[in-house]
Amino acid sequence: MIIEAVDLFYLSMPEITNEVDGSQDALLVRVSGSGLTGWGECEASPLTSIANFICPKSHGAAHPVSYSVLGQELNSPQDIVRISNEVREKSLTILQTPHTFSGIEIALWDLLGKYLEEPVYKMLGFDKTFSKTPYASQLFGTTPDETYEKAKSSLKTGYRAVKFGWGKFGIDLAEDQKHIEAAREGLGKDCKLMVDVGSVWKDDLNEASSRLDMLEKADVQWLEEPFYTDSFSAYKGLSQSTKVPLAGGEGCHNPLMAKNMIDFCGLGFIQIDSGIIGGIGSAKEVADYAVSRDVQFVNHTFTSHLAFVSSILPYCGYEDFIFCEYPVQLKPLAWDITIEHIQLNDEGKIDIPEKTGLGIEVDVEGIKPYLSMVKIELDGKDFYQTPSL
């Protein structure tokens, strides 16, 4: 099979706010060949990645991503590995490349699975999949009372684990204490509580350390992203000062970055987004490495169920990796991207679809209201315009 076309679609809510919520817009990728289509989603700034895909080359290591994808043969997983390596080599110095290619790579797996009539998890080498315990991933409330109500609601819905993140957490010590206490009170003592602070402390070990007592008393399952992704010494120092495991890695945009975090940051959990790191294959490489280093692998997902499935597939065949991030505050755009949605089973867990490819289909009619039409001109000539859905 030949990769005949790669089409990018910029989707957006009518209004984009300053809320740290990646489900407000999306860049979908459609890859076509042999009369079949595969879909993927980039965790990316859509317009930036469109430019990255079609831009003129600047030099030998700054080609557009399209240069290494269009016209390639796609008949086996090894072809995806080969294309991935070529993209990295030919578009090495364009920093947006991993974000852009991630969605394309995901779509390649979907297309190949449909072509070979196999689910992606089997092409990754797994014989079977294991259910994951979802944690209801959401933002902290604007007040401790709102955090408490969110916690109660999640518990009532049936979640055994809940993560609160971002908001204003990490700025005021006294307010942080109130939010943590509210979350724990709302969840009760048996529900797992995770906390994501979105790198709010940059690389300030003292600021992070001042919250350890409250986190330990609340029996927090993990503290996520206390620092920037590359703040290795701060991560390591904090890990040696607390019983609370640290989680991080969503900012990793290649497997080596994630492996370095595993080796040098003292992490208990490595959290990877297939839409950032280079796709499903790159995420699977990290999951395999996490097994060898006795570190828990977890997906990062705060967008659509297309992205959700893509980020669980790399570790769905590992029984000991038990958690998965399950976003519960999606904007309508993110929900409307797919026809199917992955729901909790009778045991309150998540199962991977068994169908060919990714096992989940894009709702073409459902996304049309969110489509942003893009036209790029260069030297007075049309260089790019949004393709037809």
What are these regions (language model features)?
Residues F130-T242:
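Metal-dependent enolase-superfamily TIM-barrel catalytic cores that perform enediolate-based chemistry
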Residues H99-F101, E105-G141:
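Glycine-rich, aromatic-flanked loop segments that form ligand/cofactor-binding clefts
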Residues V31-S32, L36-Y115:
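Metal- or metallocofactor-binding catalytic centers and their adjacent structured scaffolds
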Residues L92, D213, D219, D230-A247, ...:
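Shared catalytic-loop signature of beta/alpha-barrel
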Residues L358-L389:
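Extended hydrophobic packing segments that form well-structured cores
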Residues M1-W39, E43-T48, Q329-I337, T386-L389:
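Structured beta-strand/loop patches that form or line metal/cofactor-binding pockets in enzymes
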Residues I3, G35, I104, E117, ...:
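Conserved, mostly hydrophobic/aromatic
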